[in-house]
Structures are given as C-alpha cells and as structure tokens.
Curated annotation (Swiss-Prot):
Protein name: 1,4-alpha-glucan-branching enzyme 2-2, chloroplastic/amyloplastic
Pathway in which the depicted protein is active: Glycan biosynthesis; starch biosynthesis
Family of the protein in this entry: Belongs to the glycosyl hydrolase 13 family. GlgB subfamily.
Upregulating conditions: Induced by light when associated with glucose, fructose or sucrose treatment. Induction by glucose is mediated by the transcription factor ABI4.
Location, primary (coarse class): plastid
Tissue-wise expression: Expressed in seedlings, roots, stems, leaves, inflorescences, seeds and flowers.
Assembly and oligomerization: Monomer.
SMART domains cross-referenced by the UniProt entry: Aamy
Amino acid sequence: MVVIHGVSLTPRFTLPSRPLNTGFNAGNSTLSFFFKKHPLSRKIFAGKQSAEFDSSSQAISASEKVLVPDNLDDDPRGFSQIFDLESQTMEYTEAVRTEDQTMNVVKERGVKPRIVPPPGDGKKIYEIDPMLRTYNNHLDYRYGQYKRLREEIDKYEGGLEAFSRGYEKLGFSRSDAGITYREWAPGAKAASLIGDFNNWNSNADIMTRNEFGVWEIFLPNNTDGSPAIPHGSRVKIRMDTPSGIKDSIPAWIKFSVQAPGEIPFNGIYYDPPEEEKYVFKHPQPKRPKSLRIYEAHVGMSSTEPMVNTYANFRDDVLPRIKKLGYNAVQIMAIQEHSYYASFGYHVTNFFAPSSRCGTPEELKSLIDRAHELGLVVLMDIVHSHASKNTLDGLNMFDGTDAHYFHSGPRGYHWMWDSRLFNYGSWEVLRYLLSNARWWLEEYKFDGFRFDGVTSMMYTHHGLSVGFTGNYTEYFGLETDVDAVNYLMLVNDMIHGLYPEAITVGEDVSGMPTFCIPVQDGGVGFDYRLHMAIADKWIEMLKKRDEDWQMGDIIYTLTNRRWSEKCISYAESHDQALVGDKTIAFWLMDKDMYDFMAVDRPSTPLIDRGIALHKMIRLITMGLGGEGYLNFMGNEFGHPEWIDFPRGEQRLSDGSVIPGNNFSYDKCRRRFDLGDADYLRYRGLQEFDQAMQHLEENYGFMTSEHQFISRKDEADRVIVFERGDLVFVFNFHWTSSYFDYRIGCSKPGKYKIVLDSDDPLFGGFNRLDRKAEYFTYDGLYDERPCSFMVYAPCRTAVVYALANHD
C-alpha cells in the first residue's frame, strides 16, 4: 500500500493476466491470396513454448517454463522435456538459431549485441523540473513500479530484449521440420487449428494447452518436404470458449485479407519462399537533427477515387515528399483494420500490415525506397485501444471479456467505441512490446508516432477534462500508472535496442516528464505533439481579423516546457476529417471552387486566405517547436474535407449516422491541384517547399537561440529571432509599414531569405528581394542592433545575415 497526498493507493499491476476472443466461420474451399511473385526480407524464427493441457490454469505464471519436443523424428507432436527460461543451456529443437549461430551472424554483420540498459535511479527529473518535488511520492512510486517490472522481466524472461521478441514464440513459426503454432487463450476449453490446409476440419489438428493457458500444435512437413500449411492460405483458430464455439484470426497473425464477398477478414499464413522475400538494399538514415514530418495515408494518397497501393505511393508520392523538403514521412493506417473509415485507428490485427494497399513485401519496398531518398519513416502505431470486433479482432478472443483488455466498463472507450488494453497484464505487455519491435525489426521503420497517449495515461482518458497545467492533474489517482509504466518500457526498449529510432507521443494533457529519458525518471518520448496549436488556429479563424491578439498567438506557440521537444503543426489529419475544415477551407470557403484559377480575377476572400495560409504555417514552424508536421495535401491548401467511403450506420441506441454511398470522391489527394501552374494552389505549394528548404539550410527549429523582440497589438506585428534568422510578421489586414524598425542580435548586412509576398508564392511582389539591410548600433526592443524594413500587410518576411554560409 502506498500513500499519495493522503490517499491510499493499491498498486494495480499484477503479473498474471488473460486475453479476449473473436469468432467467425469459414467455408471449406481452399484459396490462396497470392497469385504473383513478391520480393521479401527474412525468416521468422521461434523458440518452443509450453503446451500441456491444464483446464484449471487461467493465469500466466511468473516463472514461465518452456516445453520442447523430445524427438521430432520419432514423435513430432510429443512433448516431455521441461526447461526453465532462466537456463542458459536451453535448446530450441525447431532449427532455431543457436547462440553460436546468432553470434556468428552478429559478427558477420558487424553488429554489436543489443542490450537495453538497466534502469537508473529516476531522480534527475527533480533537477530538471524542481516543481516535481512536491509530487515525489507519486513519481517515486511510478519509477519503483517500473524498476520492479524490469527486474521481473529480467528474472523470468531473460530481459527486455528477449521479452520483446514474443513473435518468435507465439503465433506461427517455421523450422526445417515443420510449423509450430502457439496462442495464449487461457479462457478456451479446447482449441484446434483450421484452414484451407485441412479443409477447415476442426478435428484434424487439435491443439494442446500448457499450465499457462498457451495452446500449441506442431505440424510436420509433408512427405515431399513442403510445409503443411501453404503460403498464402487461410487459417484460423477454433476454440470452445465460455461464450461458445469461436473461429478467430490468430492474435499474432502477420497478414490478413478480406476476400471478395466476405465481411470478416481471414488470417493468412504468410511465409513466402526465399525468392519472393524482399531484401532491403539501403541503410536506414541517421536521425535528423530537426524533424520535418509529412503525415500520409497510403490508401487515400491517389489523385483518383480509389484505394492506393504501397507500390504507387513508393513510386509517386515519396519523390514528391523528398522534393518538398521534408525529411520524414509518417505513415498512418499500417496496422490492419477491418473498417477503412476508422482512418486506421480501430486495429484488428496488430502484426499485419493493411492488405488493402498490397503485400508485406510491397510495404518493405516502400520503406526501402524512402530510405534510399534519405527519408526517415515513422509509423502511426496504435497501442491506446483496439477494435471491438469479435469476428476478426482481439475482442473476446478466448471468449472472455478480460483477455487482452480490462473487464467491464473500464475496458471500453465510450467515445471511440473500442476496447482498452489492460497494461497491468504480463501477456499484454509481451504482446505490445513485441508488436513495436516487430515493426522496427521486420519492416525497418525508423520510429513511431504513438496514437492516443493521453487516453492511455489517465483513467478518465482525457474526456471532458480541461487540463490547466496544474501538476495535481497529472499525479493522482486518475493517472493509470500501469499504462505509464508500459510507455516507459516501450520507450526504453526502442531506444535501447534501436538508438536511432524516434518516438513521438500524441498527448494533449501536457504530462510533465513526458520527454525526459526513462533513466532519469521520465516517460521517455523524444517528442510531444504540440496539439494545442491547431486548436488555437481554428479558434482564431472563427474570429474577425480585428480580434486576433498577437500575444495569444505567441503564448500558444511557445507554451512548452524547457528541454521538452515538440512537434508543431497548424493542422493534421484530425482537422481535415468530415465535420471539420482545413485551414484553407476555413479561410476561403466556397470561393475555392470558382476563383483559384490564375486567369480569373481573385476575390478579397481568396487574397486573404492565400496570405494567411502562408503566414500561419510559417509562424507555426518558426515558433511552435523543434519539429514540424504537415498532413499530405495541406501544403497546397487542399480543398474540402476527408470523407471515407461508408454506408449508413445504425447505433445501439437506434440512431442512424448517414453514409456517403461508399464514395471515394473525398477520400483522395488532389496533388494535381498543387502541381498545376494555372491554379493558385501552386503558389501555396511553392511556399511550403521554400519553407522546408529554409529550415534545412538554417536549422532554426533546433537552435537554442529564440527571442521575441516585438509583440505589437496595435500594429499587429510580431518580430522574433530563431537561430540566425529574424522573422517579421505583419498580420494587419490593411496597414503596411515603411521604414519599420526591428531589433536584432547581430550587427551586419541582412538580406531577405523568404518572402511570403513573392509572386512565386501567389503574393503581390511588394518587396525588393535583392535589397540589403544594414544594422544600426543601439538598443532597440531589447536587442543590441536594429535595421529598417518595409512590412507590407498580411506578409511574413525572414531575414538572414548576408554572409551566412
């Protein structure tokens, strides 16, 4: 029992836990989902897990033991020898690499063995932020729980490195002798593996259960040496559960497909022959000093009303991203999700890439091409919740409500209509940690944007809560310590095993310690998404220009903790969804339909919209954080909104959400608009490209030098220094200022390096971009020097010393 602020707190974490089930039946016909050759990467190797039947066991033991086959030649399905996982001499008999073989591979590749460093004392957070000392009871308890977790993992699993390789033991694993399939389903009373390979006969391949609730079966090769389950064929696990007989997609399935005419997805046994495996050709880029992220959704990345493919995205969109000047691409909706309109956030199969866009090999090819272009690839990973589907997801997987998720109301997110993980479960930790590692290891993603972190960290999930920044909001009984511990574990695992990997957390609450290393007592993220900025811009755009407050803009953009790196954005995919508007649409509305052609007279609404669109994005990048994000298409002011194809939805309360007749018209990206030199979208795209290249050349987002010298509410002018640059924004709707004096820190000759009024960017060409600006000595706006400029209305101009390299 621990006391925090006078309230007793019983630790919620328990080592054992249980999963959940999904169910559906399949036909008896055999079917392969692969009709052509596909390139690929590497095999998945697995060690043996226990497999004795014990109907009384519902929990995972803290001292896990593993059963391995006695003699595969004599009795491939017999198990008799028991080895403790702590044993250093345990052998895997399924042609798994031995320790010597592994070390040989490590030596051949010149790779050092990867080890997650042990926890520190977690006390440095109090030096970084002295305000945290008031809450040391909570924070010390949190870190104590984390250290205990690490100790238990070291003791019973051989460390975090081994624990995060659950995909080598659970799910399907292939050896020279055959295929082993294991599934953790303690609620099931009986289980069998079914599929095309055995004509869906539930009596053909009955599984056995061990004392920890893990079901297992070994299928020896056919007499001709071929695997018992053909690559590309359908598979499921049939279980007798407390909820009845259920046919479920294996929880660790690596690929799943929805066949034409079928509603639920089918699990696919995915093990292509060597010649079809994609082999990565290009090294992963080093972590960029400043992140400029292009947020993208592969399915909706086509100009045509269709679901786009990994191959098309690789060939058509990646070069565009590179040309625009971004150095990272963040890909949404990678994990398989049966409901396309969920934008990828209702995940059903966590280890499977979305089959709508192609095969796993084609996704690997996409990532490899991005690396060739020097782009870092981040995955939008969803560990905050899961689809509540029982037919093709994790929900009710073994017939129980509390398998992978919390039982009862705590296990449901009423707003998202989804299930919530129990982060205090040992096997849930194994599942999610292994999932993160799988994407890094198998697909070579360079990091993650973790979705919905606020929902994870609080039992109220951030719903109907207005965070004010008061520290009592973060460190009390409404904080889910188990979830925070999981986030610490996954960040420690990622950064320990993949030092160049990047983690970004979507947190709207402003949780202190969020971006402090785990060793120092923090949660361990590299960046926090600065979500308040986008909300502020929408709030501003609903007001008249006369009501915009310069101080309000500056406060929102700079409201972040010292030493906490943030990703700023003016708008992301959230603002583009149906029911909302993009910034461009807020600004220009219906005029976008008729007045974006350069050969047609403009309107005041279009002129205002084009000017403010550029200014909003530049000041967001200039002041908002150490990284920047843009959702695809918004760089050129993509019109309208995103609306995924969907039918009418009837909710449980009887209400109806109208559909759009399954139209793809607003579920695509009209890149042709930004490329057309006869449309005004082109100028917005050119400006965004110039903005990215300016940051690349000057690196201002990661400079420690930032000074706001002018915040003039009467003139509507903001002047600030970031790095070696001086930014001047005139938000006034009519007033332009001649001989306007601005302060600067360094003397010398200045030049214009970016001008939003450039006609190339759809501006009015009111500035001489070849002019030189010489400084005067003497204090002005608290700066040692100053120079005189012309500041046209609704214009942003960036100045740099003329002798900058």
